[in-house]
Amino acid sequence: MYYKIVELKVTNQGIHERKIFQGVKIFSRSKLSKDQKSILTQKLYLTPKQNIVYYQRTDVNYDQNWHHHKDYYELAYGQLDRETVFKVCQDFDELSPFLENELLEKLKEKQSAGKFFEKLDI
């Protein structure tokens, strides 16, 4: 009822794959690196079997430089080694290498209280 088909692009050593599963997004954020040259995108999904899917992608921040240097796009794209992480786990604690502990604790609280889904009669 709440779950949708999710399709994620995963790159591993230059080999492109697509991971397709049923899930619902429970967390998403994008943040700039300190040097503002790349963007880190992180997403979490919950599956019908109550597994947690973590997806992380690092991309070049084209907005930062392409208009300043006309061939930045070509240079950056040629050097781009897309980094993606796709991890399926049973518990939020398995994600401690990727997400801060305070956030993981909040997610665990929401899961144990059953607060990822709120059915509204509006």
Regions found by a protein language model. Name each.
Residues 1-122:
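Terminal leader/tail segments of proteins
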